[in-house]
């Protein structure tokens, strides 16, 4: 049973980083499934290409795409892959496919265009890494994840068709061979490119592991493991050496950014351990997520999500908020794209804290105001304290006003402004 490795964009940000990836892979003597994200910041750059494209500015979209292609070519040259004719022909074919798509102008479905354009980040990175590993002596096969990961027809945050995906992966993958494939992307029944959501490469690794019955998934990160808080916002962070699947699901649901929230469930279903390791400090054992008996003495975790929006919604006639109101409200959230992170309701109002783009927020408020009174605060911050020992807000956030406070047995949450 193979191990599944996942390398994120920061771990392959330049030629030196890709050489480090090679050293990690070479230290394992077994066959591997290697899932790779787009090279650092490439997804953001290709999102810029997409924004120009849907504004019908094909010239700017092509200009930005060529800048990204030029960057990838510089890495190719530094890794010494220029003389590999087969590789360069394939890479050129991919770049031409992207540029031709952009030249043809916007399609009717912007989400389809997004998935198509952004997917080239993963296609470029995996082709480079697969070829480089071959050059250095590791036999492997590059495989297009879109031929294996079968999804629903929605192009963004597409749902996995587990039966079809399981059939394709087990029909195609020989567990005696090392493969390099893409995170984040799949395809629908029509063969159109779909995406699993930002940071979805972790989920891709879990999909492969579930289908193959792998003995471990290792996610290689730029931190020493799963931390109890984001060091960007909090001092004296600690590595959670070993936690249960249940606790990992709770943390990812509450917003912990190290693990994609869909990753844990398929691993738990087949009792496949997950390790979060540092690609910098490779001797560090990192964090382990597995089926364990949880200790009564738990480490407090702090999850801070900035730039949220707080919406308070009430009926126009001051009638109670009932289930049918909430059902209608959530239907609007789903249609316009609000990701809800916290909910609270009283007799006359329903409040949610979540994340949405500024443009979509205005559309959302206008839609809700057709039937409801709506008040909102933008740029609020959501703090979640898991396994809290007291009710104190960390000193670094003391100057913020508390708009909402929620408390359960193990978790306390604040919406702050």
Locate the predicted segments by residue.
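Nucleotide/pyrophosphate-binding catalytic subdomain
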Residues: 1-256, 264
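A conserved active-site cap/scaffold subdomain adjacent to cofactor or substrate pockets
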Residues: 242-290, 295-297
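Conserved NTP-handling cores and scaffolds of large molecular machines
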Residues: 53, 255, 271, 372-375
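Short, glycine-/Ser/Thr-/acidic-enriched flexible segments
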Residues: 9-10, 39-40, 185-186, 201, ...
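Conserved dinucleotide-binding and phosphotransfer motif residues
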Residues: 136, 270, 336
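A conserved regulatory-domain signal marking ACT and ACT-like small-molecule sensing domains
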Residues: 285-417
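Structural motif
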Residues: 2-3, 31-34, 73, 140-141, ...
């Amino acid at each position: 049973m193979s191990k599944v490795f996942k390398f994120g964009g920061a771990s392959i940000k330049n030629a030196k980083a890709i050489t480090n990836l090679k050293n990690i892979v070479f230290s394992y003597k077994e066959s591997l499934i290697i899932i790779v994200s787009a090279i650092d910041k490439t997804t953001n750059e290709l999102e810029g290409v997409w924004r120009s494209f849907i504004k019908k500015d094909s010239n700017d979209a092509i200009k930005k795409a060529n800048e990204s292609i030029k960057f990838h070519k510089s890495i190719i040259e530094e890794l010494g892959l220029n003389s590999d004719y087969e590789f360069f022909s394939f890479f050129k074919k991919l770049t031409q496919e992207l540029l031709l798509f952009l030249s043809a102008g916007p399609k009717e479905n912007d989400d389809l265009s997004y998935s198509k354009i952004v997917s080239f980040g993963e296609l470029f990175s995996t082709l480079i890494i697969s070829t480089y590993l071959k050059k250095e002596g590791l036999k492997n096969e590059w495989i297009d994840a879109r031929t294996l990961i079968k999804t629903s027809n929605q192009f963004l945050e597409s749902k996995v068709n587990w039966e079809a995906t399981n059939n394709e992966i087990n029909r195609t993958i020989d567990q005696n061979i090392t493969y390099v494939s893409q995170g984040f992307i799949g395809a629908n029944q029509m063969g159109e490119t779909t995406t699993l959501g930002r940071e979805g490469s972790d989920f891709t690794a879990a999909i492969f592991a579930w289908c193959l019955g792998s003995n471990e998934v290792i996610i290689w990160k730029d931190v020493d493991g799963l931390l109890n808080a984001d060091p960007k916002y909090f001092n004296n962070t600690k590595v959670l050496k070993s936690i249960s699947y249940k606790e990992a699901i709770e943390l990812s649901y509450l917003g912990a950014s190290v693990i994609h929230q869909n990753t844990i469930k398929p691993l738990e279903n087949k009792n496949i351990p997950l390790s979060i390791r540092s690609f910098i400090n490779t001797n560090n054992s990192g964090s382990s997520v597995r089926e364990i008996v949880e200790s009564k003495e738990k480490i407090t975790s702090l999850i801070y999500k900035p730039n949220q929006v707080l919406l308070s919604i009430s009926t126009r006639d001051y009638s109670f908020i009932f289930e049918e109101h909430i059902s209608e409200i959530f239907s609007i959230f789903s249609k316009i794209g609000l990701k809800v992170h916290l909910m609270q309701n009283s007799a006359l109002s329903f409040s949610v804290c979540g994340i949405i783009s500024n443009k979509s927020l205005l559309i959302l408020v206008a839609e809700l105001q057709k039937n409801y009174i709506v008040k909102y605060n933008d740029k609020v911050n959501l703090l979640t304290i898991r396994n809290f020992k007291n009710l104190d807000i960390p000193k670094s956030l003391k100057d913020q006003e508390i708009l909402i406070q929620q408390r359960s047995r193990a978790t306390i949450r604040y919406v702050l402004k």
